[in-house]
Amino acid sequence: MEKQGKQFISDYVIDGNRLDGYSKNGIGNYEGPVAFEIKYTHRYNPMIMRYTVRQLTGILDSEKIKHMILIYPADSDKMRYFLRNENPNLILWGITEINGLIDANKEEAEYIANSLFKLEIKKELNRRDNDWKKSREELLTSVKKAYKKGNISLLLGAGVSCSAGLPNWKTLLNSLYTNFVNKIFNDDTVDDDTIKAITNKFIEINNNSTLAIARYLKAGLSQKDDDIMFISAVKDALYSSQRTSSPLIESITNLCIPKRSGAKVKSIITYNFDDLIEESLSKVKLEYKTIYRDEEQHDSDELPIYHVHGFIPGRESFDREASLVFSEEAYHKVYSEPYHWSNLVQLATLRENNCLMIGLSLSDPNLRRLLEIAAQKQSKNCRHYAFIQRLSNDSLIDDSSCVKINEASVNKILQTHHIIQEKMMESLGTRVIWFEDYSEIPVLLDEIRK
């Protein structure tokens, strides 16, 4: 409006009808006076629309307004046809028109979006510090409801396996590189300290991309086009450490045990290679089906466990035809193929079920992409939940540092960080269930099962 040199008045009243906007001189190709009405909804409601159209048509009939622009995101061809027949001066601006305005006024649109986001952050900062625990209880109640309905799927990350003593990503790469160095020196006598020093230095130098390191190691540990040597090396590194009992895996297993009314967990998607979940389910004699490639199917009485990055069992031989999403090229392959079976499984699960994410850092760009796609197809309500650890003051205040950091400033920074993290995850259709210590997660899972 400013670019066209035309005045705009918000919250304008005509004959007792309060409208969202008014321009005496019109807008664009629409001759004035022009009035604006905005309806905030993402679903078309015929009853509400008929009432709205009747009200706006009445204002147009009074001839005090030349054109009426209805801004309504839940537009449809049927609705446009209906409005044209009612009154040709009743104009609909739907998603297409709104996006067109945004594209034509990108700087202004970005300014508005940033201003709204800052207002939202400021409002959230006024909450009391301990409100997050109250919010957590409310979220757990929502998860309980979905669990009781049997509409929960579990998404499990490396944190689950690490809770039982298996190596994290960095430790796994260290073990593989040690294997690689030993392979280079072959029969030469090289002491363990030298190998360890070389390994640590290599990982430090190439720390910017762990996927690139994995690709490098795969090339070094494989033979020609055969991945068997590499998968064997991964298996050795994965299961070399002593397993420990895991309260987290026990709590996950308990969630999966059916109740009288039936199974409450519909499926498990794991991004881990190991069989710790299968091993735990076997102990309680729960029927399951491990699925790690397209051809696999499960029976109705089996709990499907999808290993979307591949599967390497501990005590059994691995499938020689199986592939791992471990290195850079494998990740690129999955990322670039929208109809890859693992993408289809994840997307269907995210669209159809309430997902509870455990032990995931949520930094995986492919998972974030799938979450965003699923969120676009859903209503504005978030239907997924993720356990995420809160940052503490100690993580930002370094006692050894020469710079004295004000604790009050750190508290404000952390509070803002946590709010932004929540808003960012909400844009991916996910609500954050905060925890401070990993030992809290099994307790919270047990609370969901009650």
Each model region followed by its residue ranges:
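Acidic-basic catalytic patches of nuclease active cores, encompassing PD-(D/E)XK
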Residues: 1-17
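Conserved catalytic cores of phosphodiester-cleaving nucleases, focusing on short active-site segments
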Residues: 19-57
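Glycine-rich phosphate-binding "P-loop"
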Residues: 36-47, 219-248, 321-338
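Structural motif
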Residues: 37-42, 71-75, 309, 360-361, ...
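Nucleic-acid nuclease catalytic cores
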Residues: 60-93
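Short, charged/polar "capping" segments at the starts of alpha-helices
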Residues: 75-81, 276-278, 392-398
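SIR2/sirtuin-family catalytic core signature
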Residues: 96-154, 160-162, 174-175, 179, ...
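Glycine-rich phosphate- or other oxyanion-binding loops that anchor nucleotides, phosphorylated ligands
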Residues: 305-342, 348
